[in-house]
From Swiss-Prot:
Domain of life: Bacteria
Species assigned in the record: Prochlorococcus marinus (strain MIT 9312)
Pfam families given in the database record: PEPcase
Residue positions of the active site: H175, K630
A molecular function (GO) term: phosphoenolpyruvate carboxylase activity
GO biological process, one term: oxaloacetate metabolic process
Recorded catalytic activity of this chain's protein: oxaloacetate + phosphate = phosphoenolpyruvate + hydrogencarbonate
This protein's name: Phosphoenolpyruvate carboxylase
Record GO cellular component, one term: cytosol
Keywords: Carbon dioxide fixation, Lyase, Magnesium
EC numbers on record: 4.1.1.31
Gene3D superfamilies registered for this protein in UniProt: Phosphoenolpyruvate/pyruvate domain
Cofactor(s) this protein requires: Mg(2+)
Purpose of the protein: Forms oxaloacetate, a four-carbon dicarboxylic acid source for the tricarboxylic acid cycle.
């Protein structure tokens, strides 16, 4: 069995086999075609295969683009509904297989870069980072990084100081457009693992390889017969389960390896530098705790999420401890043990007589096994307690319940904190060391405990600012203040809030029935208090205020925290870190002014947590990429975030405050996404200082964390970029001429973007008619609504994620580039010589290079011929003229932007300098075309029926009298095309 099915293969001429990626694509092509031939009727399978080859080969042969696309349109329009659904599923499967393959190739390249001891060197008189920069999207490894830092004469002491202070936090989020079912993700992982085995062909016999191919084909056929669409709207706890999958399957084991790799690289280049014992990379989560615009996230849900996370960690620790007990068979007949360990065994014997009776005979001369038996029992008791808490909710008084029922308390038997578990493991480790023994499994488990604790990830609470001000307004109305809260000026609000924060008497009466919304707001703070009592402050410490506009927004949250016991006035200690999220461009501009007001309040500064050896106060601030981009366009959003970081860091330094910037990046370029290495290096010099917090959106989790080496690649990429940015100061961000140029570009691009998006009265109708935005809202893919306000249909209520999603599906990708060309053109029209300055910026300034790189990548994915088909076919007749005008504006801006980007980069074609990315995008751009036309065909038929409600649910299509079909079937077909295009574009929103 040389291939999945012996067929004539004419794709060899289409794909170069010199590259590993191209070579393996042939395997995927063969697999895909073989599955279609077995799962579809013969004529249908051949038609689908020909359709894909037509979309690919015709462009390569140089046929007129419009002519060959018309051929595809004719084929698509001739399909009945069953064929259309089969086509949507087939192309979706194809792209998902290609995605798996590309991830596997990325994984292999990372393994090669890690195992390659020969660091790519640059001449002594050049920038040691030049080879890395030349590769653009190829990050350096730990080994490369430390070698280059040594060449730059970075002192060991400076590096060690940074490592001591380094604090990287990656925050997983649920995603309103996470398109792939959890069930399908599992199948993708199995396919990836089988591909990995097949690709080591030099170690396989012909029979072994053929057997693996049979297994691979079986898995994909099972996948084909699995429903791709969610059958019900996922609950928040479903989303929690989805996010926890990556911790359970990948990250739990990957994190100790990451630490091992950085330690090995330090030993080679900086042998005197000690890696600190604490974790430099930690995880957070919004899944189950982000309640902004999601009424499904209740206090009860957040409580159960915390219990689920602890349950997962306890399960992993029980498994690891059981393996340790099998391994640590050291006998006292042949080895000493520490006196501390022996003393602990005696203490445990008294506490756990049943365990002693059951295990003492078997392990009487094996002290480590006996100790680990006691540890296992403590973990199981902790697990039992956790299950009780999860089942009964956050208001459940466990201790009171036990007392009432006269049940003996399990006092001192379960682990009350992770520190007790750590102490037991340290006893074992130190006893081994005292007798000249080591056990890597013990060290690995200790590393995992240091990183994950019992909490797994910190849960950030997020809520929109008006929820707090509305609650306080209701409170002040009840208290009958002389001036109601909503009538106060900002200065009056600050004074009243600070006075109340300094008052020890309670403000909120306990016996009042509040409105449901206010009661919910108060309950969140009560639940957080209970969470911290049970789990410790690590489980839930940060409270993010979305749409922060003013200093009072933060003080309101502190006041509510004080009322619920989260703030100790005597010790000036707050158990809640209040984090403002500045989202719009105007709010980003005002952010330094807002924070300066707060830093001038001694009371506020005293509440900030003190961190590090310096024991300085720490302020965390979040910067929103999504809404600022939707509000003002790509250039303006990125520039204002860049400027805000510099201004905020300068402000913090003047006030002797440490700053941790939290970047709310999305998966797509229109929401701050893109290569992490480039993005972090592009942060203003001096703003990181080893500290960064970044959202990891639900839609990109699979591409970053589905495979072990992929996860390590991403984690090493982020860590090396943070170290490089913090230690290698390029000082280019302070160049006045460059800053002035960027400010002009930002203002011009913002003006042009807003003229189209917010000032053109027809744009909203255009977006709703020519993109599948309304159908996207019918996908059962998220617990969160697509709009902030129920029933609202204006742009302001639409979330940034579906905004980007709709433009991506229709191949405009408008939020990621519109306005750039006009801004650049305006600059060059005033002074043509500025092109040289722009080229210098692209070559030397990481921020500008990142900006142009993202625009270039996005432009390469745009297909205006396909987009025009959406406009012509889906646009209503009454809007034809205005829609044509809008498309003309978009088309001109695209051409202008593309030509000027190429002029700046000095290339003839987009992505010319990144062969791998260009190859991937080219394959997708060509093969995805039928899906776009298919989506338009299905949307047109679906909307025609919606506009003219039929007497019966079942109809005969006016274009195809072959069979009856239902409106729900049409919707299903349309949703399947959304799945396929999302897979082909490799992102949604």
């Amino acid at each position: 069995m040389e291939s999945f099915q012996q067929i004539k293969n004419n794709k060899v001429d289409l794909i170069s086999t010199n590259d590993p990626l191209d070579k393996n694509r042939l395997l995927i092509e063969d697999l895909w075609e073989s599955v279609l031939r077995e799962e579809c009727p013969d004529d249908q399978a051949e038609r689908l295969i020909q359709l894909k080859e037509l979309s690919y080969s015709k462009q390569i042969e140089g046929d007129s683009s419009k002519t060959f696309k018309k051929e595809i349109v004719d084929i698509v329009n001739s399909m009945d509904l069953a064929e259309s659904i089969a086509a949507a599923r087939a192309f979706s499967l194809y792209f998902q297989l290609v995605n798996i393959l590309e991830q596997r190739v990325e994984e292999d390249r990372y393994i090669q870069s890690f195992t390659n001891k020969n660091v790519q060197k640059s001449p002594d008189n050049l920038d040691p980072f030049a080879p890395a920069l030349a590769r653009q999207n190829a990050p350096v490894t730990f080994r490369e990084l430390f070698y280059r830092l040594r060449k730059l004469n970075v002192p060991p002491g400076k590096l060690e100081e940074l490592l001591q202070e380094m604090d990287i936090r990656l925050v997983f989020t649920a995603h309103p457009t996470e398109i792939v079912r959890h069930t399908i993700r599992h199948k993708q992982t199995r396919v990836a693992n089988l591909l990995k085995k097949i690709q080591v062909e030099q170690f396989l016999t012909k029979e072994e390889k053929n057997f693996l191919k049979i297994q691979l084909k079986e898995e994909v056929r099972l996948w084909w017969r699995t429903d791709e669409l969610h059958q019900f709207k996922p609950s928040v706890l479903d989303e929690v389960d989805y996010a926890l999958h990556y911790f359970q399957q990948v990250l739990f084991n990957a994190m100790p390896q990451l630490r091992g790799r950085i330690a090995e690289a330090l030993t080679e280049n900086y042998p005197d530098v000690q890696l600190p014992s604490q974790s430099f990379c930690n995880f957070g989560s919004w899944v189950g705790s982000d309640r902004d615009g999601n009424p499904s996230v209740t206090p009860e849900i957040t409580w159960r999420t915390a219990c689920y996370q602890r349950q997962l960690m306890l399960e992993r620790y029980i498994t690891a401890t059981s393996h340790l007990r099998d391994q640590l068979s050291v006998s006292m007949q042949w080895s000493q043990v520490s006196s501390s360990l022996l003393e602990s065994l005696e203490t445990d014997r008294v506490k756990f007589p049943a365990i002693y009776e059951a295990r003492a005979t078997r392990y009487r001369s094996e002290p480590y096994r006996l100790k680990l038996s006691y540890i296992l029992e403590k973990l199981r008791l902790t697990q039992e307690r956790n299950n009780l808490l999860a089942d009964n909710g956050w208001k459940f008084d466990l201790e009171g319940e036990l007392n009432t029922k006269n049940i003996d308390k399990v006092e001192n038997l379960y682990y009350k904190s992770v520190n007790e578990f750590t102490y037991d493991l340290e006893l074992i480790k130190n006893s081994l060391i005292s007798t000249d023994l080591t056990c890597e499994a013990v060290n690995t488990l200790l590393t995992q405990v240091h990183i994950f604790g019992f909490s797994l990830a910190s849960l950030d609470i997020r809520q929109e600012s008006t929820r707090h001000s509305d609650a306080i307004q209701e409170l002040t109305k009840y208290l009958d203040l002389s001036v109601q809260y909503d009538q106060m000026s900002e200065d009056e609000k600050i004074k009243w809030l600070v006075d109340e924060l300094n008052t020890k008497r309670p403000l909120i009466p306990s016996d009042v029935k509040w409105t449901n919304t206010t009661e919910e707001t108060f309950s969140v703070f009560k639940m957080v208090k209970r969470l911290q009592q049970e789990f410790g402050s690590r489980i839930c410490h940060a409270y993010v205020i979305s749409m922060s506009h003013s200093a009072s927004d933060l003080l309101e949250v502190l006041l509510l925290a004080k009322e619920m016991g989260l703030l100790d006035q005597n010790s000036k200690n707050s158990n809640l870190l209040v984090v403002p999220l500045f989202e719009t461009v105007e709010d980003l501009k005002r952010a330094p002014e807002v924070m300066e007001k707060l830093f001038k309040l001694d009371f506020y500064k005293s509440l900030l947590p003190k961190v590090g050896e310096s024991f300085k106060p720490l302020q965390e601030l979040m910067l929103g990429y999504s809404d600022s981009n939707k509000d003002s366009g790509f250039v303006s959003s990125n520039w204002e975030i860049h400027r805000a970081q510099i201004a905020l860091q300068n402000l913090a330094s003047r006030n002797n405050i440490l700053l941790r910037l939290f970047h709310g990046r999305g998966g797509s370029v229109g929401r701050g996404g893109g290569p992490a290495y480039q993005a972090i290096l592009a942060q203003p010099s001096g703003t990181l200082k080893g500290r960064i917090k970044i959202t990891e959106q639900g839609e990109v989790l699979a591409s970053k964390y589905s495979l072990p080496e992929l996860a390590l690649y991403n984690l090493e990429t982020v860590t090396t970029a943070v170290i490089q940015n913090s230690l290698v100061n390029n000082r280019l961000d302070a160049t006045p001429e460059w800053n002035q140029l960027m400010s002009r570009l930002a203002e011009t691009s913002r003006s042009h973007y807003r003229k189209l998006v917010y000032e053109n009265p027809d744009l909203l109708n255009f977006f709703q008619e020519v993109t599948p935005i309304e159908e996207i809202s019918k996908l059962q893919i998220s617990s969160r609504p697509a709009r902030r306000k129920k029933g609202a249909k204006d742009l302001s209520s639409l979330r940034a994620i579906p905004w980007v999603f709709g433009w991506t599906q229709s191949r405009f990708l408008l939020p990621s580039w519109f306005g750039v060309g006009t801004a650049l053109s305006s600059e060059l029209n005033s002074d043509p010589q500025q092109i040289e300055l722009l080229r210098v910026l692209h070559q030397r300034w990481p921020f500008f290079r990142m900006l142009i790189s993202k625009v270039e990548m996005t432009l390469s994915k745009v297909d205006l011929e396909v987009a025009k088909y959406y406009v012509d076919t889906l646009g209503s007749e009454e809007n034809k003229d205005s829609f044509d005008d809008i498309f003309e504006v978009i088309s001109k801006e695209y051409s202008l932007t593309k030509s000027l980007v190429l002029e700046i980069t000095g290339k003839n074609k987009l992505l010319e300098s990144d062969r791998d990315l260009k190859s991937s995008v080219s394959l997708r751009n060509k093969t995805i075309i039928p899906l776009g036309f298919l989506q338009v065909s299905l949307l047109r038929r679906l909307r025609d029926q919606t506009r003219q409600p039929p007497i019966s649910e079942f109809l005969i299509d006016k274009d195809e009298s072959r069979r009856a079909y239902s409106r729900s079937e049409l919707l299903r077909g349309a949703l399947l095309t959304i799945n396929g295009i999302a897979a082909g574009m490799r992102n949604t929103g």
